Amino acid sequence: MPNRLRLVVFDVDGTLVDSRAHIVDAMESAFSGVGLPVPSREAILHGVGLSLPELMAQLVPDQPHSVHQTLSEGYKSASLARHMATGQDDTAVFFPGIREVLDWLRADDFTLMATATGMSRRGLDRIIMQHRLDGYFQTTQVADTHPSKPHPSMLYAALSDTGVQAEDAVMIGDTSYDMHMAKAAGLHAIGVTWGNHPVDLLADADKIVNTTDEL
């Protein structure tokens, strides 16, 4: 991996912010709402990073597409309701050291930043507002307008928007979906161990880091 890269692309859930409690609560509400057994916390968090329909299909593969869609809408409604009820600061907090990493990269005029997330546009905008990240990212790619990870569509769009070549860019994420997406698009890949997938699932990463200091 080069010593200096032009574009740094971040996953959001599990990489920048810890929203695990919020995700599990919203998922429990969605499944209870249609009378289905709630999946385990481990199963739910293992699928974080996929688009909602893909995640629901992974959690209940025996259910039809219509149920996956209903679950996805139920999750969105529960997520918004919890956000409105508890306030912004309760739903997605920065992992320790992330603010410093983002501020450090932003201060470097050479470096561009982007996001590639399985979140919706509304969800990402909420986090950007919550953490006052307006102007940090040159491009933000979300699940609303792309195939689910690990399809490389989001990274292709980020490269196109910034005019950066794949060999000059890195994807930073906490799941195997992020690593596979990066490799499919020709980007370097850094896996972080504080998120949702165990280190053995990050084997495709060029580097694995355990702390934001290492990052």
What annotation goes with each model-predicted range?
Residues T15, M27, I98-M129:
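Substrate-recognition element of Asp-dependent hydrolases with the DxDx(T/V) motif
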Residues Q58-D103, D108-F110:
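Metal-dependent phosphoesterase signature
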Residues M1-V8, R121-L215:
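Asp-based, Mg2+/Mn2+-dependent phosphohydrolase catalytic module
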Residues A30-F31, S51-S66, I127, A158-L159:
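Helix-loop "lid/cap" segments that line or gate small-molecule binding pockets
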Residues G47, S51, V93-G97, M119, ...:
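Short beta->alpha linker loops
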